Amino acid sequence: VEQDPYEIVIKQLERAAQYMEISE
């Protein structure tokens, strides 16, 4: 199964956004 690099980046950005929300 080939993963779309953009999909990986989006998922990481979503994770980063959640982490920043928790940190605030």
From Swiss-Prot:
Q: Which keywords, in A-to-Z order, does the entry hold?
A: Cytoplasm, NAD, NADP, Oxidoreductase
Where does this one sit in the cell? Cytoplasm
Query: Does the keyword Thylakoid feature in the UniProt annotation?
Result: no
Q: Which GO terms describe its cellular component?
A: cytoplasm
What are its E.C. numbers? Answer: 1.4.1.3
Q: Name one GO molecular function term.
A: glutamate dehydrogenase (NADP+) activity
Q: Where does this chain mainly localize?
A: cytoplasm
Q: Which reaction does it catalyse?
A: L-glutamate + NAD(+) + H2O = 2-oxoglutarate + NH4(+) + NADH + H(+); L-glutamate + NADP(+) + H2O = 2-oxoglutarate + NH4(+) + NADPH + H(+)
Q: Which domain of life is it from?
A: Archaea
Q: How does it assemble?
A: Homohexamer.
Give the UniProt family note: Belongs to the Glu/Leu/Phe/Val dehydrogenases family.
Protein name in the entry: Glutamate dehydrogenase
